Amino acid sequence: MDMNRIVLRLYITGNSVRSQQAIANIYRICQEDLGDQYNVEIIDVLEQPQRAEEEKIMVTPTLIKQLPPPLQRIIGDMSNTEKVLLGLDIVPEGLQVRLPED
C-alpha cells in the first residue's frame, strides 16, 4: 500500500439518515481534499458488532484514521470539512497553512 495513502474506517449504525449523511460527507471530503490518496471502509456495527467492540466504538458515526499514524478519531457530525480534516490531523495537498507570526 502507498505510504501516503490515508486509510479511514467509518463506523455507522444501519441505514439511518445519520449514517447516510456521514457516508456522503466523508466521501465528499475525501474526493474534494484528498484526491485519490484515500481508502474508506464502511463498517455497520449492527452487521459487524465484533469489529465495533474491538475498536471500542460506543457512538456512531465514528470515523477512525488508521494510517498514517497517529490513529485519530472523530465522533458525531462530520459535515464541516475543516473540522474533520483538522480532527484527523490531515493537511490536504496544496493547502496553505499559515503559522502565527511572533
Swiss-Prot record:
Keywords: Biological rhythms. Pfam families: KaiB. One of its GO terms (biological process) is rhythmic process. CDD domains: KaiB_like. Signal peptide: none annotated. The keyword Lipid metabolism does not apply. SUPFAM superfamilies: Thioredoxin-like. InterPro entries: KaiB-like, KaiB_domain, Thioredoxin-like_sf. Purifies as a monomer and homotetramer. Interacts with KaiC1 and KaiC3. Belongs to the KaiB family. A paralog of KaiB1, the major clock oscillator protein in this species. KaiB3 and KaiC3 may cross talk with the core oscillator. The monomer reduces the ATPase activity of KaiC3 by 55%, the homotetramer has no effect. This is Circadian clock protein KaiB3. It comes from Synechocystis sp. (strain ATCC 27184 / PCC 6803 / Kazusa).
